[in-house]
Amino acid sequence: MRWDLRRSFQRIEWHGPWPPALPEARPLIVCANHHHFYDGHLLWYLLTDTLGRPSMVWMQEWNRFPLFAPVGALPFPPDDPQTRATTVRRTARQFQAHPDAALFYFPSGTLQSPNVGIGPYAVERFARLHRLYPDALFWPVALHVTWDGAPHPVAQFQAGPCLDLERQAPGAIETHLRRQWRRLRETTAAPTHLLMRGRTSPADRWSFAWTLPLFKRLLPP
């Protein structure tokens, strides 16, 4: 997946304080918008490859793409409640075995156009996850893909604080996620941390300065 990201993006950026303030011994449910094909890859790169936390994602089409199992994909077919229940239990066991593990969760349920924006999400979804995994903290992570003056897409991350639903309302997850996503879309600030340098642009690879004497002679007087 690292190779796939490197060939698909000009760079992957983090906006905001780095490294993020995450608890070492609490499971995370990473709540992210799902606007781009590579969102799952990007979250894996951030949480597992960069921050070193084991990760999982519930995947509706796992039967079609079981090759993602080694990187934490678990089957979650919409028409098979028994398999979904097994995945829920397997996730709980992973959280117990690895207290720093992260579950990627897309509240929209499906891939959506960025034009749709963030939400509204049914807060009962977050409340249900909290009942299943009461020790887990919810971490709203916004993803945005832009060209940003580059010849290839640039992926950007920005995150809110970790939320404990024992103390905060489930609706706070959507509020923080929307706020961070809007900041990413409107930001003109440089990233605080470069997570990956991917495809180089032609301007970075090529220089024709050696032809300067020739073309100078072709300029009009």
Please tell me what each predicted stretch does:
Residues 21-22, 65-67, 147-151:
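Short glycine/serine/proline-enriched coil/turn segments at secondary-structure junctions
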Residues 88-221:
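Non-catalytic C-terminal accessory region of glycerolipid acyltransferases
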Residues 1-11, 63-72, 199-221:
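Alpha-helical membrane-targeting segments
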Residues 9-15, 80-92:
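Glycine-rich, highly charged phosphate/nucleotide-binding loops
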Residues 5, 39-42, 122-126:
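Short amphipathic alpha-helical face segments that pack within enzyme cores
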Residues 20-25, 51-52, 95-99:
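Flexible, charged surface loops at secondary-structure boundaries
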Residues 1-34:
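Helix-to-loop junction immediately C-terminal to a conserved catalytic motif
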Residues 24-82:
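Catalytic core of membrane glycerolipid acyltransferases/transacylases, capturing the structured
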